[in-house]
Amino acid sequence: MRELTVQTDCGLIKGMEENGALAWKGIPYAQPPVRFSAPQPVEKWSGVRDGTRFGPSCPQENEKRAPMAEDCLYLNIWSPDTEGARPVMFFIHGGSFAGGSASEPAYNGANLAQKEDVVVVTVNYRVGILGFLDFSFLDEAFRPNCGLLDILEALRW
């Protein structure tokens, strides 16, 4: 398996070859989230980040999606193993905003990237009460729909 290191605006990420595509997993797109607050842009890192494993799923009732952690704002990228610009498919997992994870096997983008010649991006975002509970009536510092704000931050990354 060939390992690949790429330079991003935030730092170096080591990826790998997977089923004929290039893959970088577990890339942070925001700072570890503060409960019920909008995500903050990720800071630059030094050294090389390991992009060969998925980041944790966001906390939810479905225990089958372990490991889970509140520090869950990570995305995954699969690209064809060819030069040149490609269209990007940004995939937001389902789950009625209550559950789901970008690391589910059904959302592995390697085959789609290789066969359809697109770059595939999957993203974790806060779900359930951590992503969509509205406390703004108590304090304006709380933001409703943090999960949607997470998705917007991933698109900005």
What are these regions (language model features)?
Residues 1-148:
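Non-catalytic accessory segments of hydrolases
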Residues 151-157:
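Short, well-ordered amphipathic alpha-helical segments that serve as non-catalytic structural scaffolds
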